[in-house]
């Protein structure tokens, strides 16, 4: 039985399948690290440290996990290697709980008296940002929400075109002014349009030009300021999209975007095509930003609300 009603059997199977490469890689390394050992000793812990780091969990998070296991060894005196999986599972779940105080439940959104819920989406080109917006729009629509898209990534013509294609595919309206338009002006129009249509949620795409952080910071600050004038408190959510298959590069992007603007949610995509799923654990722990969605496949439904218990369950099943 699923631990949460909203987490259907289909979604759990999709999650299991999406994390298969990460799981196989992790447990193959783990099995090799304890071969010939009956209890957890210094050598096993050294090997485990290497397994976690090479699984893209990250050095700082790995050391936190190792410290916890060392405490357990010191307390219990003798710890069998057969107990290692259960202890690791518990420690990783606990780490994720610190950053994800409450799991994302389905595709529900808060209600604001001033107007629709506004999500500003940020991320570099190639991480699956536009696809994530399209899948979010689809799932919000499936949940009975009225959605409006705003094409404020006006730096690339392809970005606007891609978002138009997604709006047509999903069947939701889009506000766009084409390439080189003022991004803040597009966001302003999108929010005005959404209010006029009594929309429930507005999703604003933005340009992700990390090579010029000052320009990016100024642009995002201007977009936020303009949106706040239309709907006080907007954007309510600044969602950073990261490509999980890039491993530690995703972590570096998260750090850089956190300098550029106040990120308060993460979407980690492309986990199905990689063995680097451990990056979810490291980014969540180090950045202290909730992981809200994970991408575990190509399908429209394969952008899933992140559930820490189900995620760890799939890794250790």
Task: For the regions a language model picked out, list residue spans one by one.
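P-loop/Walker A NTP-binding module and the surrounding RecA-like catalytic core of P-loop NTPases
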Residues: 35, 93, 99, 105-317
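Non-catalytic terminal/linker segments enriched in charged/polar, low-complexity residues
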Residues: 1-120, 138, 142, 146-149, ...
């Amino acid at each position: 039985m699923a631990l949460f009603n909203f987490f259907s059997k289909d979604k759990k199977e999709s999650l299991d399948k999406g994390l298969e490469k990460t799981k196989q890689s992790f447990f193959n390394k783990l099995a090799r690290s304890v071969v010939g050992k009956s209890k957890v000793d210094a050598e096993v812990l050294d090997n485990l440290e290497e397994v976690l780091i090479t699984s893209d969990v990250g050095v700082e998070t790995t050391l936190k996990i190792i410290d916890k296991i060392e405490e357990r060894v010191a307390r219990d005196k003798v710890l069998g290697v057969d107990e290692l999986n259960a202890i690791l599972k518990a420690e990783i779940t606990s780490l994720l709980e610190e950053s994800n105080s409450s799991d994302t439940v389905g595709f529900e959104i808060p209600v604001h008296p001033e107007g629709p819920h506004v999500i500003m989406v940020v991320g570099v080109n190639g991480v699956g940002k536009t696809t994530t917006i399209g899948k979010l729009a689809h799932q919000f629509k499936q949940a009975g929400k009225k959605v409006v898209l705003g094409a404020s990534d006006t730096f690339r013509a392809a970005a606007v075109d891609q978002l138009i294609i997604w709006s047509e595919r999903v069947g939701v309206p889009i506000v766009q002014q084409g390439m080189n338009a003022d991004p803040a002006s597009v966001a302003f129009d999108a929010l005005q349009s959404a209010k006029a249509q009594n929309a429930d949620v507005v999703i604003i795409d933005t340009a992700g030009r990390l090579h010029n952080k000052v320009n990016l910071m100024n642009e995002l600050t201007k977009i936020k300021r303009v949106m706040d004038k239309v709907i006080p408190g907007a954007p309510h959510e600044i969602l950073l999209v990261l490509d999980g298959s890039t491993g530690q590069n995703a972590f570096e992007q998260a750090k850089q975007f956190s300098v550029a603007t106040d990120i308060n949610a993460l979407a980690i995509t492309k986990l199905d095509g990689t063995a680097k799923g451990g990056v979810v654990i490291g980014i969540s722990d180090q950045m202290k930003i909730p992981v809200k969605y994970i991408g575990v496949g190509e399908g429209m439904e394969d952008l899933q609300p992140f559930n820490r218990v189900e995620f760890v369950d799939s890794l250790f099943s």
